[in-house]
């Protein structure tokens, strides 16, 4: 009984103590009480409020701790000091994007980072590494966001060779949670609006100085400092989408200490010639190296602690030139640049053209074919009229294949019609995913004119927006002509509100009699057109309309010899006429047929011009060219 009474008293004292703690009488305050007290004093004296400068820390990757049973205590218990499922769920990892961590093992000891980035840029289109660093083991580490880039890096394992040292770079990738947290959609939209209003389109200038003090942030009581990795990445993503052609950028007065996240500017804003990093908190010399590669000519860096470490101006200028060798104005004072090269006027960018044609005659031929082809292909009765397209294909040697895939940036977009998507996916011939149809590969492509016509008639009805067509001729020879048609189209129920998709169709055709051609190869690619992609396509298309289609300049002799009626794509006449011309050239020159044919071909099958050229170079023609 005494034992029970003692137990009861002890239990009562513990209950009273815990109850006092909950009520605040036990001398212990919980986190909510501390937060309320801190905020109350902050309202009385704003200087006591945190500036959140502790957010500006170097990026630390999220590490997954895998603890074996033997390290969890006696008996292999999964409890003890281990984290429960509930505690892991509250760590914030679920609020992070899944990215790909890439590692070049031992490369930091053998090759330069700039060299390796250059090699990867040549292999991977639009390569944008994040948080590039080298660890204590001598490895280069960085992150990429999309799986395609990670797969390409992994596929080039030991294929990148440093010729001077003979080093073959080994690449490894792994899927990990991103070391930055995701922002809410509302926060991202506000950041985009703030960036938009700070952009000067006329001068191509983006002013992000005092970014966190923008009135729109203050009105919503938001702390959107550029010292936070997720905020900086959101800003950089928006720059990449809309303002990649800026020539001047200001990041002054943002309390920036580290440039790990901002270093992505090197692959995003490649034309920045004026950069303002003044009045930040950069204190180490190595930070500025992360911006090396930008063609900066005017640089502002005053007001950073690292500047005070230089006692001589020459040393300060030399330090800046290590990252920006073209810098000719530093902190408003002219300096002698380390590298002087030809001035490239980035305003004279290569114009986006509305396609390419080798000559006007080929343009007429291609446009007539495209118009006639889609007259049969489109319309509410397209599944019936497409059967007539068997006349457009070679009877036996023609092939047709279709691929539907999401392009980068629209991976989460969905086709507007599930039934149409299922029809496309059922015959999709994506060679990157051929393991899915390796056993029945023959069913994914059609061969022969009749089989192709049947395959086309089974596809959903469509209506192509012909005013969006862009045509590029990529191959021209005497026997083959290759061209690509790309643009927008609608499919499915054409009576509903149009929801356009993007297509690219590559034709390979050969000449036939009576001014006609026959399709040898037809490859159709379809993808969902997201709103962002539609906006970009419209901008490019408007620019192409202003610039017009590119047509190669040819001489009057070539134009006179190039035609469609009975001639090949390179201007050669039909075979009977060609044989007669070769025979006449043999009689005129005394050369054997192969050399006579070459002489005529070099002169665009202009007989008079070929005879004139032969008389000019007769003395230099080799003896074996003449009949004995």
UniProtKB/Swiss-Prot annotation:
LRR repeats lie at residues 245-270, 271-294. GO terms for cellular component: cytoplasm; nuclear envelope; nuclear pore; nucleolus; nucleoplasm; nucleus. Residues 63-72 have a biased composition (Low complexity). SMART domains: TAP_C. GO terms for biological process: poly(A)+ mRNA export from nucleus. Residues 100-179 form the RRM domain. Gene3D superfamilies: 3.10.450.50, 3.30.70.330, DNA helicase RuvA subunit, C-terminal domain, Ribonuclease Inhibitor. It is found in: Nucleus. Keywords: Leucine-rich repeat, mRNA transport, Nucleus, Repeat, RNA-binding, Transport. It comes from the Eukaryota. One of its GO terms (molecular function) is RNA binding. Residues 47-83 are annotated as: Disordered. Residues 365-526 form the NTF2 domain. The keyword RNA-binding applies. Residues 576-628 form the TAP-C domain. SUPFAM superfamilies: L domain-like, NTF2-like, RNA-binding domain, RBD, UBA-like. The leucine-rich repeats and the NTF2-domain are essential for the export of mRNA from the nucleus. Involved in RNA export from the nucleus to the cytoplasm. Interacts with nucleoporins, Nup98, Nup153 and Nup214. Belongs to the NXF family. This is Nuclear RNA export factor 1. It comes from Caenorhabditis elegans. The lineage of its organism: Eukaryota, Metazoa, Ecdysozoa, Nematoda, Chromadorea.
């Amino acid at each position: 009984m005494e034992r029970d009474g003692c137990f009861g008293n002890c239990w009562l004292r513990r209950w009273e103590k815990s109850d006092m703690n909950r009520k605040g009488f036990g001398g212990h305050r919980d986190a909510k009480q501390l937060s309320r007290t801190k905020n109350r004093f902050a309202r009385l004296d704003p200087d006591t409020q945190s500036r959140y400068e502790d957010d500006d820390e170097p990026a630390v990757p999220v590490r997954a701790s895998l603890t074996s049973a033997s390290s969890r205590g006696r008996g292999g218990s999964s409890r003890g000091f281990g984290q429960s499922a509930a505690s892991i769920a509250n760590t914030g990892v679920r609020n992070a994007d899944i990215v790909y961590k890439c590692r070049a093992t031992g490369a930091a000891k053998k090759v330069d980072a700039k060299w390796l980035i250059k090699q990867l840029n040549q292999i991977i289109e639009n390569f944008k590494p994040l948080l590039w660093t080298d660890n204590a083991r001598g490895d280069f580490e960085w992150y990429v966001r999309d799986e395609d880039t990670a797969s390409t890096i992994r596929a080039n394992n030991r294929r990148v060779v440093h010729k001077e040292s003979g080093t073959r770079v080994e690449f490894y990738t792994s899927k990990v949670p991103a070391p930055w947290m995701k922002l809410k959609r509302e926060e991202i939209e506000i950041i985009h609006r703030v960036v938009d209003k700070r952009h000067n389109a006329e001068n191509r200038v983006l002013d992000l100085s005092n970014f966190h003090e923008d009135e729109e942030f203050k009105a919503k009581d938001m702390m959107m400092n550029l010292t936070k990795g997720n905020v900086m990445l959101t800003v950089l993503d928006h720059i990449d989408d809309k303002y990649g052609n800026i020539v001047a950028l200001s990041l002054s007065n943002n309390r920036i200490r580290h440039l790990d996240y901002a270093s992505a500017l090197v692959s995003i804003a490649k034309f920045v010639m004026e950069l303002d990093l003044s009045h930040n908190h950069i204190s180490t010399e190595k930070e500025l190296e992360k911006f090396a590669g930008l063609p900066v000519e005017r640089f502002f860096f005053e007001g950073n602690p690292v500047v005070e470490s230089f006692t001589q101006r020459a040393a300060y200028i030399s330090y800046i030139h290590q990252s920006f060798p073209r810098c000719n104005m530093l902190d408003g004072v002219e300096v002698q640049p380390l590298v002087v090269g030809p001035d490239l006027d980035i305003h004279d960018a290569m114009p986006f053209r509305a396609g390419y044609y080798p000559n006007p005659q080929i343009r007429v031929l291609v446009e007539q074919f495209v118009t006639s082809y889609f007259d049969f292909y489109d319309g509410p009765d397209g599944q019936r009229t497409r059967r007539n397209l068997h006349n457009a294909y070679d009877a036996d040697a023609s092939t047709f294949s279709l691929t539907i895939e999401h392009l980068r940036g629209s991976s989460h977009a969905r086709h507007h019609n599930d039934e149409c998507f299922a029809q496309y996916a059922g015959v999709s011939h994506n060679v990157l995913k051929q393991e899915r149809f390796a056993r029945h590969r023959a069913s994914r492509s059609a061969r022969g004119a009749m089989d192709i016509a049947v395959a086309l008639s089974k596809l959903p009805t469509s209506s192509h927006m012909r005013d969006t067509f862009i045509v590029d001729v990529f191959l021209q020879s005497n026997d083959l002509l290759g061209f690509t048609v790309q643009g927008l189209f609608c499919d499915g129920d054409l009576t509903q509100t149009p929801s356009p998709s993007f297509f690219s169709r590559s034709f390979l055709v050969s000449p036939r009699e009576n001014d006609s051609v026959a399709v040898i190869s037809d490859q159709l690619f379809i993808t969902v057109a997201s709103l962002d992609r539609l906006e970009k396509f419209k901008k490019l298309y408007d620019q192409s309309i202003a610039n017009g289609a590119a047509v190669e300049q040819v001489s009057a002799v070539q134009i006179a010899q190039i035609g469609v009626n009975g001639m090949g794509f390179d201007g050669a006449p039909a075979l009977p006429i060609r044989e007669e011309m070769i025979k006449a050239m043999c009689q005129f020159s005394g050369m054997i047929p192969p050399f006579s044919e070459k002489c005529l071909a070099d002169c665009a099958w202009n007989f008079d011009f070929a005879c004139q050229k032969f008389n000019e170079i007769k003395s230099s023609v080799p003896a074996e060219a003449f009949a004995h």
